[in-house]
């Protein structure tokens, strides 16, 4: 969901209706009055995403943002909004189920509860 912050890097966006697909997106707001989003609508393949633990990673450099799924490069973004220092960013893991038709698809409430286990989340900064 867009916010009034400078922007966000979505490490992973996932809805149960997507089965073996996920999304990686970049949103920027404060320095872009028209709001821009990069590739949130593109679904990336993820073999057995609903089974076991998986590693999602983001590397943000001065020229690009790289997303990884289980150690494999899944997406590269080199467009507007990448340069470090252009604005602050929030890092997100988006797991928001919906009870109605929406971006995540149509849900059947009888399928609930959904569950996701997180072992750890780490953040590092390059020196």
Named regions from a protein language model:
Residues 1-127:
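GH16 jelly-roll
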């Amino acid at each position: 969901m867009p916010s009034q912050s400078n922007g966000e890097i979505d490490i992973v966006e996932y809805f149960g209706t997507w089965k073996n697909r996920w999304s990686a997106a970049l949103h920027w707001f404060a320095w872009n009055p028209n709001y821009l989003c990069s590739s949130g609508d593109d679904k990336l393949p993820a073999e057995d995403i609903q089974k076991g633990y998986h590693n999602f990673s983001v590397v943000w450099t001065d020229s690009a943002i790289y997303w990884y799924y289980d150690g494999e490069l899944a997406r590269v973004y080199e467009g507007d909004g990448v340069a470090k220092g252009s604005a602050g960013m929030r890092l997100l893991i988006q797991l928001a189920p919906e009870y109605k038709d929406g971006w995540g698809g149509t849900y059947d409430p009888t399928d609930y509860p959904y569950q996701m286990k997180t072992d750890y989340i780490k953040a590092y900064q390059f020196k």
